[in-house]
Amino acid sequence: MTDLSLYRNIGIFAHVDAGKTTTTERILKLTGKIHKLGEVHEGESTTDFMEQEAERGITIQSAAVTCEWKGHRLNVIDTPGHVDFTVEVYRSLKVLDGGIGVFCGSGGVEPQSETNWRYANDSEVARVIFVNKLDRVGADFLRVVEQVKKVLGANPLVMTLPIGREDTFTGVVDVLTKKAYIWDDSGLPENYEVTDVPADMVDEVDMYHEQLVETAVEQDDDLMMAYMEGEVPTVEQLKKCIRKGTRDLTFFPTFCGSAFKNKGVQLVLDAVVDYLPSPTEVDPQPLTDEEGNETGEHALVSADEPLRALAFKIMDDRFGALTFIRIYSGRMEKGMTVLNSFTGKTERIGRMVEMQANDRNEITSAQAGDILAVVGMKNVQTGHTLCDPKHPCTLEAMVFPEPVISIAVAPKDKTGSEKMGVAIGKMVAEDPSFRVETDEDSGETILKGMGELHLDIKVDILKRTYGVELNVGKPQVAYRETITQAIEDSYTHKKQSGGSGQFGKIDYRIRPGEPGTGFKFSSVVVGGNVPKEFFPAIEKGFSTMMAEGPLAGYPVLDVEIELYDGSYHAVDSSAVAFEIAAKGAFRQSMPKAGPQIIEPIMKVDVFTPEDHVGDVIGDLNRRRGMIKDQEPGVTGVRIKADVPLSEMFGYIGHLRTMTSGRGQFSMEFSHYLPCPNAVAEEVIAEAKKRKEEKAKK
């Protein structure tokens, strides 16, 4: 297929358990890609193909599937709903042109829905909404529509209305055409009939139809004038307006149904084709220089342009190493040579495949707009740009969050050590939010991630997929250090031992930076007291020392250092001398600047039945939580709080005990805050103890 207007690159994203994967399964069934439906709760779904996914009933990796609907090519990505795997959602949104936001008809707008919606807004991805599970007890379509308005600040445009409620839910009314779609009891998605609107719904449908028309015609001044003069717009005219409003993020066409019961999914697929943009209708990707600054040029969406593509995911499966690629410009063909603009090296394109979850179809070429996988690429990582060697360029980089939790692991025997090294190398390539370090003193391997579940899954993969038996330590919090006072100081490095010596003197100011800014270095030196060529060495000296603070050896955050004077020696001064001076200055000045331990604070979202609210709030308060909001729902209460990560280990078990198994929660990193003195003293004492134990070894 070469007509780019017939392409749709879409993602399906939502909260855990809203029915994303089941919706994807129904799409595959309807588009003829699978013949037997696999259910998530039975561990059989097509896109949840990792053992851990099938077992836990959650999607961990973004599985890519290609299918067709009404002459259009759909590249569909099913993304995880659990907050520990939001990096998968983020990088999927980076390469998508549109999306389906799935909400649970009874649960409504749940915690992860907000996070994913925020990411999609940041990426300016057009979306349609599917309110799922309307066959469930407590499901209420219009209540969820109101929540979308209130909680997400979005403008849902009601396109279908449910016929019946809960166990009497039989179909939907298309508000645009005023036709009813009613499914029989066979459970087959194709077994439905199109009839007139049920008599008891005529007034409601008329009201929503009028609202739809009035909202749609606002996208076209001429059509709006004609409508105000009494002219009735055609369905095609309205579709054109809805398409424009959807692409501009003015509103979000909103549908209802039950993916599990095979009701209503066809209309969502029609909406993908009718309203979501093709690759040619989204803003072209900006090109950047080596520092990541935009150059003003763009990757134009055309097969005739030079190749510009982004590697957005690395995955090791039973077929070998796969690199998932979105092509923005030009063509990619089997056997061609491409330049990796990040490494400066070229690679030959070997086997190219079109993915269907865990199956693949071999292809020999692909073009702008395509999402594909290449087998066996050697030096490509997530976020790397692949381009025509004659036209080098760099696409906007992908930035991933820093881990907030770590655990120490060690193989139980020597044979596991080599296996673990190979396995971890593959896992780090696959997941940019998963980091691994080796403790130089103890030799322990430290795994770092976004949450307990994230690391649990990684340990599980090491054990079961790669057969590495492990000893696993307790989770550790990623504490940091910062300063609270601004000081002015001076440091001289002087060394004379025969022949040429070393000399470097720096006068500098150290002050607390804005939260989240990391380390900033600047110079206001006038004249030649410290030559400019030594500035990078001074910055490097300070920057290197930020890795280990004076209190407990944790990395230092949010510090600004300003060089304002100094002196040098024409013979003895060098970059090395000034770098050593900066390191000495850090050691000298940090203890004077009011150093402080800071801890990661998590944004916690708890759902609890109403009769357990007091227990849950009391427990969060005991965990040093700050309650931010309480929102009553149909089946319980949602509590939002900021809680230190150190207080949240093992929380899910405690919550289930408190709420008789009915409570749920999610959390994501929010910000760092100073620890209370008692906690800081404990952290410092623990660090001192570790240091002493290492010294004995």
Swiss-Prot record:
Belongs to the TRAFAC class translation factor GTPase superfamily. Classic translation factor GTPase family. EF-G/EF-2 subfamily. Catalyzes the GTP-dependent ribosomal translocation step during translation elongation. During this step, the ribosome changes from the pre-translocational (PRE) to the post-translocational (POST) state as the newly formed A-site-bound peptidyl-tRNA and P-site-bound deacylated tRNA move to the P and E sites, respectively. Catalyzes the coordinated movement of the two tRNA molecules, the mRNA and conformational changes in the ribosome. GTP binds at residues 14-21, 78-82, 132-135. Its main location: cytoplasm. This is Elongation factor G 2. It comes from the Bacteria. Keywords: Cytoplasm, Elongation factor, GTP-binding, Nucleotide-binding, Protein biosynthesis. One of its GO terms (biological process) is ribosome disassembly. It is found in: Cytoplasm. Disulfide bonds: none annotated. One of its GO terms (cellular component) is cytoplasm. One of its GO terms (molecular function) is guanosine tetraphosphate binding. Residues 5-280 form the tr-type G domain.
